[in-house]
Amino acid sequence: MRIELALDAVADAAYDRSYFHKARGRIWRGLENDDTFSETHDSNHGVGFSYSNIFPWGQIEEGDRRYFRIASPRRGLLDTLIAHFGRERAFEIGQMRFTIDDITGHAPDVGEAGSTGVLETGTGVHCALGRQLAEEYNLDTSKIDAGESETELFWRPKHGMEPLQDAIRRSLQQTHELYGDDYYDGPGEVDEPLFDRIEPIKDDVVYPVRFQPATAVDRTVLLSKWRFGYRVRDETHRYHLNLALDSGIGQRREHGFGFLNLTDKTLPRASD
C-alpha cells in the first residue's frame, strides 16, 4: 500500500540532493501525535515505511507539479498520514516548498501465480554488510578491523551478488516478522530466490551520496539502483514481492532508501 501526494511548488528552488533527513522529518510530523508510532521513533526496527524522492527530478519553479510517495505494509500508518496531510497542506523539504493539492492511495500488486514483471528501485539501495555476513561470504573485513568502516562494509560489485541478495532477504524477513502476515512463511524461510533477474540501472553500479541520518551528523554512503525481474511462483512468493513494494528493500528504508516501483506486469494467459 502507498499514498501519493500531488505537490504544487510555491517558490523557485534548486533540487536538494540531500533531501533524505528533511523528508523523513516531514513524514514524522504526521506521526508524532500517535503513540502507536511515536514510541518507536528511535528504535532499531522503525515503524515500517519507505518513501520516494520528489519527482520528477530537477530545478523547481513556482507552480510546478511534483509528486511524492510513501509506502508501508501498515494500513493504520498510511491512514494517519492521510488524515495529517489533509489538515496540514504545507509540504516543505528545506528550500523546496510545496502545498499538497491531492492525496491518492494505491495498492500495486505483482499479480497472481504465473505473472511476470519488473520492479525498479526509485531510490538507491543502502546495503551495509555487518561483520557476521561479511565473514559468511569470506569478504575482506580489514577496514572494519581498522575502524575505517565502523562496524559495516558497504556492498560493492567486487563482493558478488549473493551478499547483496542475502542482505535484502534478511531485511525483508525482519519486516515480515514485525509487520507482515504470519499466515505466510517469510522470505528468509523459503529456499527460492525473490527475483529471477537482477540488472543494475547505473553503469557504475554503486555511487556515493551525502547522507544526514540525524541533525549535525553527515556521512557518505554507497548506494545502488536495480531492476528486478520476477515470475510469481505461488501466493507466498506473491506476498513476498508485494511486501517488498510496501516496505522497500535494503537498509535504512525509513531514511529514503530502497523505495520500489512496479514498472511492468504481465498476467498469465488464461488456459484454453
Swiss-Prot record:
Where found, per UniProt? Cytoplasm
The protein's matches in Gene3D superfamilies, at most eight in alphabetical order, are given as: 3.30.70.1900
Residue positions of the active site: H41 (proton donor)
**What does the protein in this record do?**
CRISPR (clustered regularly interspaced short palindromic repeat) is an adaptive immune system that provides protection against mobile genetic elements (viruses, transposable elements and conjugative plasmids). CRISPR clusters contain sequences complementary to antecedent mobile elements and target invading nucleic acids. CRISPR clusters are transcribed and processed into CRISPR RNA (crRNA). Plasmid targeted by CRISPR locus P1 transform wild-type cells very poorly.
Induction (record text): Expressed in exponential and stationary phases.
List the Gene Ontology MF annotations in alphabetical order: endonuclease activity; RNA binding
Q: What is the effect of changing G258A?
A: No mature crRNA produced, no CRISPR plasmid interefence observed
Q: Which UniProt keywords apply?
A: Antiviral defense, Cytoplasm, Endonuclease, Hydrolase, Nuclease, Plasmid, RNA-binding
Q: Cross-referenced InterPro entries, in alphabetical order?
A: Cas_Cas6_C, CRISPR-assoc_prot_Cas6
What does the record's miscellaneous section state?
A: There are 3 CRISPR RNA loci in this organism and a single cas gene locus. A CRISPR-Cas type I-B system.
Q: Name one GO biological process term.
A: defense response to virus
Quaternary organization: Component of the Cascade-like complex (Cascade I-B), composed of Cas5, Cas6, Cas7 and crRNA.
Primary location class:
cytoplasm
> What does changing S224A do?
About 160% of mature crRNA produced, CRISPR plasmid interference restored in a deletion mutant
Which family does the record assign?
A: Belongs to the CRISPR-associated protein Cas6/Cse3/CasE family.
Q: Per its record, how is this protein called by name?
A: CRISPR-associated endoribonuclease Cas6
User: In the UniProt record for this chain, what is stated about the effect of gene disruption?
Assistant: Loss of the 8 Cas genes in this locus (cas1, cas2, cas3, cas4, cas5, cas6, cas7 and cas8b) leads to loss of CRISPR interference against plasmid targeted by this CRISPR locus, i.e. plasmid is not destroyed by CRISPR. Upon disruption of only this gene, no visible phenotype when grown under differing temperature and salt regimes. Does not produce mature length crRNA. Can be complemented by endogenous Cas6, but not by Cas6 from halophilic archaea H.lacusprofundi, or non-halophilic archaea M.maripaludis or M.mazei. Loss of CRISPR interference against plasmid targeted by this CRISPR locus, i.e.
Q: Name one GO cellular component term.
A: cytoplasm
